[in-house]
Regions:
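A solvent-exposed, acidic/Ser-Thr-rich amphipathic alpha-helical stretch
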Residues: 2, 22-70
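Short, flexible active-site loop motifs that bind/organize anionic cofactors or intermediates
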Residues: 12-15, 38, 105
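A beta-strand edge to alpha-helix "cap/lid" segment located at domain peripheries
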Residues: 5, 9, 49-133
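Short, aromatic-enriched amphipathic alpha-helices that serve as compact interaction elements
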Residues: 2-20
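Alpha-helix C-capping/helix-to-loop hinge sites
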Residues: 16, 35-36, 79
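Short stretches within intrinsically disordered, low-complexity N-terminal or propeptide regions
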Residues: 12, 19, 31, 128-131
Length: 133
């Protein structure tokens, strides 16, 4: 039986996205997944696929927050050139909304406090990082 725990699903997303396993990322998403970020928002798995394919960043989760079907993760993104040299780093935030065991919404933010507030979470919703993250 597939895992339906929102935290485990978010951890799996990071694993698959960092390993560039786009098909595995797509298997976690609902057909009408909402995708939002700096470049706007939209709906659908193809939009998520384009986002993952375009990202090309190594993502290391640093802080996790969760309540119900929402998971907010602060992570460090690192971009490298073909030789493996560090081309830039940035702390980013992503929110996962999980429904019926699938990612129904994924939203990128630049500010952790704002992301927590928007989603009705706060510092009290901090959790230990999952083992698989």
């Amino acid at each position: 039986m597939p895992d339906t725990n929102p935290i485990d699903i978010a951890a799996a997303w990071f694993r698959h996205a960092t390993n560039r396993d786009t098909d595995a990322v797509m298997a976690l998403a609902a057909d009408a997944v909402e995708v939002g970020g700096a470049r706007g928002s939209g709906t659908g798995r193809e939009l998520l696929r384009e986002w993952i394919d375009r990202s090309r960043a190594e993502m290391t989760p640093t802080r996790w927050f969760a309540r119900g079907d929402l998971v907010v993760v602060e992570y460090e993104a690192v971009w490298r050139n073909r030789a493996g040299r560090d081309m830039g780093r940035r702390v980013m935030i992503v929110t996962f909304r999980v429904e019926d065991g699938r990612i129904a919404g994924i939203y990128r933010h630049d500010d952790l406090a704002a992301s927590l507030t928007i989603n009705g979470l706060d510092a009290g919703d901090a959790i230990e990082a999952p083992d698989a993250a």
